């Protein structure tokens, strides 16, 4: 009997399921199709043998890449070798992907089957998977699939933020719309303010400058010599400023109320802000085009190149277009009208706005437009598919167009394309090396800054974490020092050596003589048995026979000890101690006098 198992790959892990006999399943294929939708009937056909969950999202991505490439991952190998029967001839494994089935059959030796009833079983498993695996909900399964799908797509598609052409499409569309709006609003300001100061329209032609002047002047009767300097700043022409001042004194315009002037000034300020935003947007578009399509920008200009990209839909679509399509791009209406009426087709579309076609003679406009479209197609392909974008090729292509234009006018033979491209390749390699070196420097600087920041954070965190243990150590060291001081004081009292105390006072010698004599008399009379008793009774009564060690003791403490030791000694010992001490005193005085 051949056992049929089904392998199901999910975003959360691998699942191995067992089915009934192959013959029985194949005979009941219509019943299988019906029972797939019903969970109860599906449980009678399929049972879960093993489930191997992925440890992390990175492991899930690795397994997904392996399955898509037809490679048996170690996790899949471990699952199949562990849970499938050892007799491989009696096992039939159903898989959804023929590539992974062929890899399993080649590496592990299991017979694999795809299609037919296996596809229906996998459809049912996919539908009821969250019910087959314990602890898995439909929501968590959907989240896992979504996350794995995003990570898998990011790995497959090389996405570069700096090469996004969507911003160029939106920017050029907004720029065209702003031009229309600024023109319309400026005409409205001219008509509105013209009732009060009609002579200003004839003096100033620029819309933005007119709106600034209308905002600054306001009531023309208030214009005087003091405002002449500001007028020169706005018009950037002293003669025009003087003419405006003279015209305001003899203007034929009607008077206007204050509320009307407020509305005119408010609307003029809006138009001025729109014109300023238009300038900043144009600067942004130029910088974006130099990043995304530097060769096309160098060849035909930022505005025309952006319009070509926007009309094509993307830089990739523009690179796919042939030169004939690029030539008439933007003139589709005229093209289809000419085809319909069997007239002459247009010679150029959006590329007409470039300076080359305007400089060419009437008979050469078609020829130069065809040549320019060819170079634009090459430049767009270089920009689209080059790893390091550079404007070297665009500059060389522009030189070729200039040479062709001069050839049409003067007959001067241009350089060959092969020589120009060889020169461009050398310069492009140098420019690419320079760009990569700059990028590496920037990356190194960024990494250094990041390391410094992390080191500062680590130092601050270590200081914060070590502040509390240090406080604990300080508090614990204080009682330890007190404990250490006690035994240090005891030997000083008992007559231990302390080199820090100077040997200067003569009183210490007197006390030392008394102590030494008493200790010697006690040793002679008491014998060996009396010494341990004395130590047990009072440890402070221990004496030191070395005169150097005993000389360091303080006089007051020794007197106290001597008074304490008097009752301990017996009567005859006491008398002997007194007599010996008197003799010692006399001897000590004689030694001092000598």
UniProtKB/Swiss-Prot annotation:
Transmembrane segments: none
Cellular compartment(s): Nucleus, Nucleolus; Cytoplasm; Nucleus, Nucleoplasm
Modified residues (Omega-N-methylarginine): 359
Keyword Phosphoprotein included in the entry's annotation: yes
Tree of life domain: Eukaryota
GO aspect biological process, one term: ribosomal small subunit biogenesis
Domain Nop: 292-410
GO terms, molecular function: snoRNA binding
Primary location class: nucleus
Biased composition (Basic residues): 580-594
UniProt biased composition (Low complexity): 457-469
Residues found modified as N6-acetyllysine: 561
Modified residues (Phosphothreonine): 468
Modified residues annotated as Phosphoserine in this record: 314, 466-467, 511, 519-520, 537, 563, 569-570, 579, 581
Keyword Transport: no
Entry-linked InterPro entries: Nop56/Nop58, NOP58/56_N, Nop_C, Nop_dom, Nop_dom_sf, NOSIC
Record PANTHER family: NUCLEOLAR PROTEIN 5 NUCLEOLAR PROTEIN NOP5 NOP58 (PTHR10894), NUCLEOLAR PROTEIN 56 (PTHR10894:SF0)
Record family assignment: Belongs to the NOP5/NOP56 family.
The protein's role, per its UniProt record: Involved in the early to middle stages of 60S ribosomal subunit biogenesis. Required for the biogenesis of box C/D snoRNAs such U3, U8 and U14 snoRNAs. Part of the small subunit (SSU) processome, first precursor of the small eukaryotic ribosomal subunit. During the assembly of the SSU processome in the nucleolus, many ribosome biogenesis factors, an RNA chaperone and ribosomal proteins associate with the nascent pre-rRNA and work in concert to generate RNA folding, modifications, rearrangements and cleavage as well as targeted degradation of pre-ribosomal RNA by the RNA exosome.
Subunit structure: Part of a large pre-ribosomal ribonucleoprotein (RNP) complex, that consists of at least 62 ribosomal proteins, 45 nonribosomal proteins and both pre-rRNA and mature rRNA species. Within this complex directly interacts with TCOF1 in an RNA-independent manner. Core component of box C/D small nucleolar ribonucleoprotein (snoRNP) particles; the core proteins SNU13, NOP56, NOP58 and FBL or FBLL1 assemble stepwise onto the snoRNA. Interacts with NOP1 and NOP58. Interacts with NUFIP1, RUVBL1 and RUVBL2; RUVBL1:RUVBL2 seem to bridge the association of NOP56 with NUFIP1.
Name of the protein in question: Nucleolar protein 56
